[in-house]
């Protein structure tokens, strides 16, 4: 998940324990640093040869790998197949390849494409469990996690987690806006867009992407950038993980790491509608240096909390927060303001690394909605949170078609996050669907592909808007035989 639920609760005031800009450049040429990738081929038309069919030759593939290959019955298989969400533990891939090199990824695609479905996995946080395909093959990229920061560039292996990325960036005095969950992979985050805690000031994670190394469906390694495979580069910035090919390495432009002031406001029960109504009017009028979210926690009564960060000092922040509380007509029962350096702030926002059982979905707010209707959706739904993540600012500067990320005009995203178990999963799923339908009826349409929902009826338009047709064209060009397929892959 881009923004972890437990992190939302922390920054919104439950606990005081202590994520890239559009058109943001740092100068200089984008020279990959520390890469172990093989030399890429010159741009060429993808193959039109249909991949072979028939059963995979696992023994042959094993001889071509420097990493491991695990199959059902192997001692380490059960642990290797596991994703973040325990609800998907019952899924059984036919194999898990623990890729160590780009050549391992190429061997997997060349040897298996067309025989079984292929899913690349970085952090394993897919809300629908698409990185654990039942009967398919998982390419686990977690060992390919090197992060090298040199000058204004960061070269990041596709298996890196956000905790790895932030540690390396912080040590170098650089910043890359991204999410809050420490075990989210850089791959899924970037490919879906990358909403994070510095989005209003610096933009989305994908907006800082300058190039990517990609193994396409024919097993070739290509460089996608503004000047090489530009259609693929466009699609990688918001088109969603699991499509088009397997990214093995990203190169990002970074910014100087700012000092930040983090904050949390916990409001009294009964004030949620007033606070949400004020928040929707307040945030768009604030400078982009301020990022804020709002959590509506389901139950009886509904609870409301606001948290976030400010690129600046506590004095300036407090003035902005006073504006919110005055307009809301509600005095916080708890108010925390704390100054931290960049790395300290990213650690402050961290949620738990522990696995979590949940169901989720999303909608997008493009203009203020009826706050009372939104709050009513949470009434009586204990264990269900509406995590409303502020957008605008730098996120809205590129045109809606400049990258595959469609929601440039959004005021906020709304993540529906519901605790669930194997026993109550069906009931919780019905509840989530009711909330999603209610959000749409209240004026919050669309959806965010990084909170992918297999039950979302309008998913293609919701995630991609008018960019959906171009994304399908890119998928047909680079994956004409649907090698990288899952329930909501863009070719479907």
Model-derived features with residue positions:
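Soluble FAD-dependent oxygen oxidases
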Residues: 2-492
């Amino acid at each position: 998940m881009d923004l972890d639920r437990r992190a939302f609760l922390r920054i919104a005031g439950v606990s005081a324990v202590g994520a890239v800009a559009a058109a943001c450049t740092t100068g200089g040429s984008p020279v990959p640093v520390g890469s172990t990738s093989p030399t890429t081929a010159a741009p060429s038309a993808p193959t039109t040869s249909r991949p072979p069919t028939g059963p995979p030759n696992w023994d042959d593939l094993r001889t071509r790998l420097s990493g491991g290959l695990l199959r059902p019955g192997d001692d380490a298989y059960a642990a290797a197949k596991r994703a973040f969400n325990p609800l998907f533990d019952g899924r059984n891939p036919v194999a898990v390849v623990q890729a160590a090199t780009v050549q391992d990824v190429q061997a997997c695609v060349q040897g298996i494409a067309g025989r079984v479905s292929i899913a690349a996995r970085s952090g394993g946080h897919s809300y629908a469990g698409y990185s654990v395909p039942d009967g398919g093959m998982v390419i686990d990229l977690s060992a390919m996690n090197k992060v090298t920061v040199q000058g204004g560039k960061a070269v990041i292996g596709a298996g890196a987690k956000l905790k790895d990325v932030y540690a390396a960036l912080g040590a170098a005095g650089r910043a890359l806006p991204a999410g809050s969950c420490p075990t989210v992979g850089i791959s899924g985050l970037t490919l879906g867009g990358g909403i994070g805690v510095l989005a209003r000031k610096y933009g989305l994670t994908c907006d800082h992407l300058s190039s990517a190394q990609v193994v396409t469906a024919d097993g070739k390694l290509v460089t996608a950038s503004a000047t090489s495979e530009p259609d693929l580069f466009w699609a990688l910035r918001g088109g969603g993980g699991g499509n088009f090919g397997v990214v093995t390495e990203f190169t990002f432009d970074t910014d100087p790491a700012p000092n930040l002031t983090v904050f949390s406001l916990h409001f009294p029960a009964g004030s949620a509608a007033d606070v949400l109504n004020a928040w929707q009017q307040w945030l768009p009028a604030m400078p982009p240096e301020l990022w804020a979210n709002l959590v509506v926690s389901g139950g009886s009564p509904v609870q409301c909390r606001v948290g976030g960060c400010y690129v600046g000092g506590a004095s300036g922040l407090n003035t902005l927060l006073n504006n919110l509380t005055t307009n809301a007509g509600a005095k916080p029962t708890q108010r925390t303001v704390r100054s931290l350096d960049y790395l300290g702030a990213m650690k402050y926002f961290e949620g738990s690394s522990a696995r979590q059982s949940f169901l989720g979905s999303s909608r997008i707010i493009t203009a203020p909605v009826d706050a009372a209707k939104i709050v009513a959706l949470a009434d009586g739904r204990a264990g269900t949170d509406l995590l409303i993540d502020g957008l605008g600012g730098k996120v809205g500067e590129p045109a809606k078609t400049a990258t595959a990320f469609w929601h440039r005009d959004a005021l906020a995203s709304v993540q529906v996050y519901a605790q669930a178990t194997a026993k109550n999963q069906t009931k919780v799923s019905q509840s989530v669907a009711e909330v999603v339908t209610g959000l749409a009826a209240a004026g919050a349409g669309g959806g965010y592909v990084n909170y992918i929902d297999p039950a979302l009826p309008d998913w293609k338009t919701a995630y991609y808007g008018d960019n959906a047709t171009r994304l399908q064209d890119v998928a047909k060009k680079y994956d004409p035989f649907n090698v990288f397929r899952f329930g909501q892959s863009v070719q479907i």
